[in-house]
Amino acid sequence: MLKNKSIRNLIILAIGYWLLAIGLQGCAKREIKNIDSKGKNIICFGDSVTLGYGAENGQDYPTVLSKMVNAPVINCGVNGDTSGEAIKRLKTDVLDREPFLVIVEFGGNDFLRRIPIEEASSNTEEIIKNIQSAGAMVAITDISADIIMSSYRKEFKRLCKKYDAIFIPSLFSGILTNPSLKSDAFHPNGEGYKIIAQRIYRAINPYLQKNALLR
């Protein structure tokens, strides 16, 4: 009886390793558009969360991320921006700065202002296409906070798949529900931004390693 149980456990373990290997292989095969980008700058393009609202100077996630990738990261966060307002400054803040990777973080203010998800999605799609046309990689952040804004997660994930962009999941998960990690109802504090930077780094690092800029 004990022997049979041990054999069964070994089989289950082997199947688990096999499924994990398949999953990792699938991730490794996913191609990102402009993986060979000749751009020079990593740019974080977003709203008050990218700006670092609620934290002290130097605690914003682009600054923390810069230390992780050992390269400059340009912070192009503007307090209160919606995805539509972002389009108006896309050229001067992003496209004219020789981007090689742009991390896009919008949607929170669209949600708060009750802008239809279809409009936010259309704006995000335009942002993606313009950045990719400039020869840069694009990473879209999942700004859904645990159970709210799940429609944004689904829509942004769809856009990433359609345009071969990097999807950064669960940016705020466990942060806005934890008083020790947030400065108010909508913004992290320094510790919260550190977690966000770590999540972004984990998502983009495999693609950075394939590009000569950060080798």
Predicted features and spans:
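Compositionally biased, low-complexity repeat tracts
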Residues: I12, L19-I22, I35, I42, ...
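Conserved Rossmann-like nucleotide-binding pocket used by diverse enzymes
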Residues: G23, I74, A139
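Serine-esterase "nucleophile elbow" of acetyl-processing enzymes
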Residues: C27-E85, R89-E98
